[in-house]
Amino acid sequence: MLAMIHLKSRILLALLLVSCISVTGLRAQNPADKVVGIYYVKDDQSPEEAKIRIYKTTNGTYAGRMVWVKNPTFKDGTPKRDIMNPDPEKRNTPADQIQMLAHFRYDAAKNEWVDGTIYDPVHGKTYKCKMWFDGDKTLKIRGYIGIPAFGRTMSWTKE
């Protein structure tokens, strides 16, 4: 009798594990979530190197924040901060914690993340932005003013 209860418990546990794995697998297959991850960024117009983590927000949009900067301090040891931010309350944000991307939604028809913004911490400016993949690991980021024709595109590499 005890052996039968033990066997039923093991079967129930196995079924529970299989169902959890199945649900996790289905979530991972959502094409909109492909953008989630860490990206290496080397801008051709700046000597800085950084890593940005793109994540899904609680409201279902996508955003990104710096998580690493190759040189987080100036030569004198002073930490680099978001001193150009137009919001005075954000000017003390460490360089490796700056919010770079916000408000992206996935457009399945275009296979792009659209209607977002990108922040340029060097100039303290925010631009409209869209993103798409060029291959499996290269994320194209197009920041622009007004329409995408008036902007520039960067390539970020997914780790």
What are these regions (language model features)?
Residues L2-L13:
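Bacterial N-terminal signal peptides that target proteins for export
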Residues V36, V41-K128:
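Central antiparallel beta-sheet cores of small beta-barrel/beta-sandwich binding domains
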Residues P86, N92, K140-G146:
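Short aromatic-glycine motifs in intrinsically disordered, low-complexity regions
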Residues L13-S22:
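Bacterial N-terminal signal peptides
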